[in-house]
UniProtKB/Swiss-Prot annotation:
NCBIfam families xrefs: rnpA
Record InterPro entries: Ribosomal_Su5_D2-typ_SF (IPR020568), Ribsml_uS5_D2-typ_fold_subgr (IPR014721), RNase_P (IPR000100), RNase_P_CS (IPR020539)
A GO MF label: 3'-tRNA processing endoribonuclease activity
Gene3D superfamilies reported for this sequence: 3.30.230.10
Matching HAMAP family: RNase_P
Protein name, entry field: Ribonuclease P protein component
Keyword DNA repair on entry: no
PANTHER family tied to this protein: RIBONUCLEASE P PROTEIN COMPONENT (PTHR33992:SF1)
PROSITE patterns linked: RIBONUCLEASE_P (PS00648)
């Protein structure tokens, strides 16, 4: 599963807009900033610091995040958001990444479904 480019935040100006909205939510592994927009669908930006490791490791983290977002796609609200990976995420398995990401997206009310888990 992949996320189309129309579902990604790419421009620095867009990242700055989302950060300046100051709607942030966090858990131990991820920080999420969100911005309400009039888009027909969500857009996501990913940020993985060089402090987390070399390029191969950072790209692995981004691949895992994109794959998890693709699985969550039917449950995501039409907002722009940026996911920032925190230290410790580099050792997580895909299932752990999904669990932690789902938790922080539910906190931010970006992920909505009928479940209460």
């Amino acid at each position: 599963m992949a996320i189309k480019k129309t579902y990604r935040v790419k421009r620095s100006k867009d990242f700055d807009q989302i950060f300046s909205a100051k709607h942030s939510f966090a858990n131990k592994k991820f920080v999420v900033y969100k911005l309400n927009t009039n888009q027909p669908h969500f857009r996501v930006g990913l940020s993985v610091s060089k402090k987390l490791g070399h390029a191969v490791l950072r790209n692995r983290i981004k691949r895992l995040l994109r794959h998890a977002i693709a699985e969550f796609k039917p449950y995501l609200t039409d907002e722009d958001f940026v996911i920032i990976a925190r230290s410790g995420v580099e050792t997580l398995s895909f299932e752990e990444v999904k669990k932690n990401l789902k938790h922080v997206l539910k906190l931010s009310k970006i992920y909505v479904d009928g479940e209460n888990d």
